[in-house]
C-alpha cells in the first residue's frame, strides 16, 4: 500500500501520487471531518468491506460509498467524523485495519489448509 502524502492542499491530495489512486473531491469541510474520497479502479469488494471496518471506529458518524456508474472504474467514499479526528486519518486507519483483518484470515486459512487437504466432499449424483 502506498503511503499518503502530507495534507497541504486538501483538494488536491493524492494517496498514490503516480496514479492518483485516491483523491479528495471538492466540497469537503475545512477541518476535514467531512470528506468524499474518489478511489480509482475499485468496486464493491473494497467499498463494502472498508465501510464495515470504518464504521467500527467510534469517532465515525457516517461512512458510505457509491459507484457513480457501472462503466466507470471508480468509487466515491464518504466519511464524516467527530471533531476529534479527520476523515483522512480515519481512512488511513480503516485501510490498515482491513489489511490486518485480511492477514488474519489468510493466516487462519493457511493453518487449516494442510489439515483439510485429505478431506473431500462427496456429491450425490
Swiss-Prot record:
- Check the record and name the Gene3D superfamilies matching this protein: RNA polymerase, RBP11-like subunit (3.30.1360.10)
Q: Name one GO molecular function term.
A: DNA-directed RNA polymerase activity
**Which SUPFAM superfamilies is this protein grouped with?**
RBP11-like subunits of RNA polymerase
Which PROSITE patterns does the record associate with it? RNA_POL_L_13KD
Q: Where in the cell is it found?
A: Nucleus
| One biological process term in Gene Ontology | transcription by RNA polymerase I
UniProt KW keywords: DNA-directed RNA polymerase, Nucleus, Transcription
* Record's GO cellular component terms: RNA polymerase I complex; RNA polymerase III complex
Parts of the chain that traverse the membrane = none
The task this protein performs is described as: DNA-dependent RNA polymerase catalyzes the transcription of DNA into RNA using the four ribonucleoside triphosphates as substrates. Common core component of RNA polymerases I and III which synthesize ribosomal RNA precursors and small RNAs, such as 5S rRNA and tRNAs, respectively.
What does the subunit section of this Swiss-Prot or TrEMBL entry state?
Component of the RNA polymerase I (Pol I) and RNA polymerase III (Pol III) complexes consisting of 14 and 17 subunits, respectively.
Query: Which HAMAP family does the record cross-reference, listed alphabetically?
Result: RNApol_arch_Rpo11
The entry sums up its family as follows: Belongs to the archaeal Rpo11/eukaryotic RPB11/RPC19 RNA polymerase subunit family.
Protein name per the record:
DNA-directed RNA polymerases I and III subunit RPAC2
Q: What is the scientific name of the source organism? A: Schizosaccharomyces pombe (strain 972 / ATCC 24843)
Q: What is the lineage of its organism?
A: Eukaryota, Fungi, Dikarya, Ascomycota, Taphrinomycotina
Amino acid at each position: 500500500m502506498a503511503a499518503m502524502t502530507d495534507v497541504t492542499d486538501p483538494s488536491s491530495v493524492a494517496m498514490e501520487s503516480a496514479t492518483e489512486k485516491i483523491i479528495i473531491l471538492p466540497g469537503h469541510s475545512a477541518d476535514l471531518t467531512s470528506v468524499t474520497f474518489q478511489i480509482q479502479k475499485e468496486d464493491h469488494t473494497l467499498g463494502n468491506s472498508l465501510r464495515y471496518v470504518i464504521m467500527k471506529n467510534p469517532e465515525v458518524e457516517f461512512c458510505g460509498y457509491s459507484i457513480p456508474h457501472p462503466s466507470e472504474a471508480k468509487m466515491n467514499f464518504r466519511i464524516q467524523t467527530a471533531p476529534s479526528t479527520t476523515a483522512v486519518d480515519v481512512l488511513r486507519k480503516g485501510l490498515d485495519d482491513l489489511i490486518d483483518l485480511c492477514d488474519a484470515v489468510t493466516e487462519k486459512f493457511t493453518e487449516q489448509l494442510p489439515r483439510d487437504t485429505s478431506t473431500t466432499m462427496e456429491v450425490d449424483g
